[in-house]
């Protein structure tokens, strides 16, 4: 294992030989990226939330960043203690690892659309419905639901790609195509959580790499870039970069407790209710894993946090979650570190087909208990469900209006791009789309081969991508305002 292969200064262009300078450059590019700033107005659980104490995607990402830093430091410390092993990380690569992990964590959600997973569902449902009845592509859509590419008609696979919108894949598209951040390959690879291209079918549970390919990790539009990235970092196709495992664990630790805390902040649950729910769910998870030890761990953690929180009754709920987080993060980080080091060979090569915190251990039971309480008692709350339905309706409604641009033949759409007066409605719709997205569309179409240009599906693929880029780039508030404007709701 040579981590200098996985952590280096290579980037698509204008690369610098110095690793420190390259990693610092990545930090600046990411922190100054508009897509990152938009996370402050994208939902974590509660869309269009006015209470600033409730998490947005940005504040969640900051918490993930801290967890990632903690795990990375813990891994470096434990590796340095292994005197019987050759040194895997020198000080230069150890420092780079921490920065790469931090930036992976802070930008891991930049591809998520407005209204979170309901926004994703709305986009996918809309495009599935659109293609299923499309006069030209309905047959290709039917073929897209199964089968592998036979070297003839590629349309079904491009349609499959378009009907599998995924925030993780959109993040790769933002980095490479839309914002053109020109990050180091290792920094981009650090957020490649899933390794399946959108043109591939989801593998069965019995298939190799079924976990790594559980969701779409990148689109066909970025496939050549991912091939290039894997070549530069010596990553086998379908495998991960080692840092992606750390980022994933940091995210798992952060969101499972944060969602419950936000529910308490909004008055949907009380601290005492949370304690009882966690106690019952944790025991249930332990039994499902057939674990008899550590049954009192979560109860003791809650009691300790509760006892310390009562010293400041005026800020009881906030203090409780501060102390509970401390009680939980340390064992979870320690476990993630142990799993990383115990499986370091497979993790180095990116073939480890599991999450660090998912191994049927009591630590796994902790995170599962937190997730299940959130799922059963936060996400299903009437207020949350109402907001999710509104988000679904808003996203679908905007797509309905922009269908005009998709229904045009290619030649007529080209007239629209020059703001032709013959299409006043379509031109006004197009003008609302940011220039960077239109530029990305034009560049992609201009780079098509002659054979691809002769097949209308390729231009249409990038036109659909243009609409998805526009919709998914909106904040919750912008999507809400756009919907009201287009449907004349005052």
Language model regions located:
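Extreme N-terminal flexible tails
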Residues: 1-20, 24-27, 427-436, 442, ...
């Amino acid at each position: 294992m040579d981590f200098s292969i996985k952590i280096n200064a290579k980037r698509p262009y204008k690369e610098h030989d110095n690793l420190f300078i390259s990693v610092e450059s990545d930090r600046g590019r990411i922190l100054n990226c508009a897509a990152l700033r938009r996370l402050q107005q994208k939902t974590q659980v509660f869309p269009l939330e006015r209470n600033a104490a409730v998490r947005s995607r940005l504040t969640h990402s900051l918490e993930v960043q801290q967890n990632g830093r903690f795990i990375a430091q813990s891994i470096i410390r434990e590796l340095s203690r292994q005197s019987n092993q050759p040194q895997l990380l020198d000080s230069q690569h150890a420092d780079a690892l921490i920065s790469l992990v931090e930036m992976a964590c802070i930008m891991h959600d930049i591809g998520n659309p407005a209204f979170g997973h309901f926004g994703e569902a709305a986009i996918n449902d809309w495009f599935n419905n659109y293609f299923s009845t499309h006069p030209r592509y309905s047959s290709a859509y039917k073929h897209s639901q199964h089968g592998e590419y036979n070297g003839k008609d590629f349309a079904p696979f491009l349609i499959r790609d378009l009907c599998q919108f995924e925030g993780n894949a959109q993040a790769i598209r933002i980095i490479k195509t839309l914002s053109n951040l020109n990050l180091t390959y290792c920094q981009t690879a650090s957020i490649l959580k899933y390794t399946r291209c959108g043109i591939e079918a989801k593998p069965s549970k019995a298939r190799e790499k079924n976990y790594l390919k559980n969701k779409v990790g990148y689109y066909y539009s970025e496939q050549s870039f991912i091939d290039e990235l894997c070549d530069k970092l010596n990553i086998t196709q379908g495998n991960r970069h080692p840092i992606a495992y750390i980022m994933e664990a940091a995210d798992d630790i952060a969101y499972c407790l944060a969602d419950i805390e936000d529910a308490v902040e909004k008055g949907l649950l009380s601290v005492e209710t949370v304690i009882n729910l966690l106690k019952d769910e944790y025991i249930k998870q332990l039994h499902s894993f057939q674990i008899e030890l550590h049954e009192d761990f979560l109860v003791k953690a809650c009691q300790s946090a509760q006892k310390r929180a009562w010293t400041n009754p005026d800020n009881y709920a906030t203090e409780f979650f501060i102390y509970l987080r401390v009680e939980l993060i340390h064992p979870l980080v320690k476990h993630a570190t142990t799993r990383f080091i115990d499986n370091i060979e497979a993790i180095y090569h990116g073939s480890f087909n599991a999450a660090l915190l998912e191994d049927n251990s009591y630590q796994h039971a902790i995170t599962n208990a937190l997730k299940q309480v959130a799922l059963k008692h936060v996400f299903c709350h009437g207020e949350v469900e109402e907001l999710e339905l509104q988000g679904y309706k808003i996203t679908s409604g905007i797509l309905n209006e922009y269908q005009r641009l998709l229904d045009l033949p290619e030649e007529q759409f080209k007239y629209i791009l020059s703001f032709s007066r013959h299409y006043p409605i379509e031109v006004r719709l197009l003008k609302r789309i940011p220039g960077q997205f239109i530029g990305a569309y034009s560049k992609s179409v201009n780079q098509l081969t002659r054979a691809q240009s002769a097949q209308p599906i390729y231009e249409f693929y990038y036109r659909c991508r243009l609409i998805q880029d526009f919709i998914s780039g909106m904040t919750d508030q912008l999507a809400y305002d756009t919907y009201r404007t287009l449907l004349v709701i005052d």
